[in-house]
Amino acid sequence: INVKLLTKRADFVDEFFRLLSAVEGYDEEICKRHIAFGFTLTGCDGQEGNSSPNPERISTMKQLHARGYRTFVSAEPVIDPKTSLQVIRDTLGFCDLYKVGLLSGKKDYGKADVQDLVDELQKLPGKPKIYLKNSVTGMLKRDRNTLPDNFVGNDYNMFE
């Protein structure tokens, strides 16, 4: 069974692997094939109480990826498009999938700002896998089929 864990914490890794390794028959190679670690990254620490700071989450994500695990970023809600883009740039090379979505109902996004974000995402080096949530495609009235190949649908399986 494939498992995706999503967190705003960075301080769980040592205890998590200590507990896993205590289980009879634990095989980290199997875990690497079936566990993906995701981190919510908004770039706005002050608005995320009881969360590890974004730089700590990014560091933990990099460590897990170096250890052989799949990783993903939930860049949502986008609080500020430029900040979200910077967080994505800061994690290039050790993130297997980016999920980008808007805050529903509480923020008045300028359509031009969201379009600029998508335009910049299309220019990222290495063509990382990106899933735009319906909040983004709906606002821009974009059909996912018109996006570049590295933009994936909700049926994308990061374990294949």
Question: In which residue ranges do the predicted regions lie?
Answer:
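Conserved AdoMet/S-adenosylmethionine-binding subsite of the radical SAM
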Residues: 1-128
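C-terminal accessory extensions appended to soluble enzyme cores
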Residues: 108-160
